[in-house]
A protein has these predicted regions:
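Intrinsically disordered, low-complexity linkers and terminal regions
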Residues: 1-145
Length: 145
């Protein structure tokens, strides 16, 4: 038996789910913060973007943040210095999911999902997460900045 995620379209066995995959990623990242955790800022944003976990404004802001990480090579510490701390998981003092969601979400076709992330070793993992982030940017190029 297989099932398709209603949000990102990932095809997974019936006893697996995107949430379960995400929990596995988080466990690896927290156990190995310097290796697997090197892409933590991307993993969380990618998962939330693909599962429509943010309100519209935060969704667009999070995608812009991913673009700065991936295309401009901005590091998470630098991003925090720029005052984008409301997307930093340590500073969630206001709701990031409250309010109108991205109306265009259902029209996005995702070319990669969390089901494509291999957990074999840190090199493969970080590579796959980075590819995932890049695919999210190109899959949503038509949306407003
Ligand atoms: Zn999913």
């Amino acid at each position: 038996m297989i099932q398709k995620c209603p949000q990102c379209g990932a095809v997974l066995p019936a006893d697996d789910s995107c949430q379960h995959r995400f929990d596995q990623c988080m466990a690896l990242e927290f156990e190995n913060p310097t290796v697997f955790g090197a892409v933590h800022h991307l993993t969380v944003a990618c998962y939330m973007l693909q599962h429509n976990g943010y309100s519209r404004d935060v969704w667009l802001e999070a995608r812009n943040m991913v673009a700065q990480f991936v295309h401009d090579g901005v590091m998470p510490a630098e991003m925090r210095r720029r005052g984008r701390s409301r997307l930093d998981s340590g500073h969630r003092t206001w709701s990031m999911s409250k309010g109108a969601k991205l109306a265009e979400f259902a029209a996005i076709v995702w070319s990669r999902t969390i089901a494509d992330i291999r957990l074999d070793n840190p090199e493969i993992y970080c590579h796959d997460v980075t590819q995932w982030a890049m695919s999210i940017l190109s899959d949503t190029e038509w949306l407003p900045k």
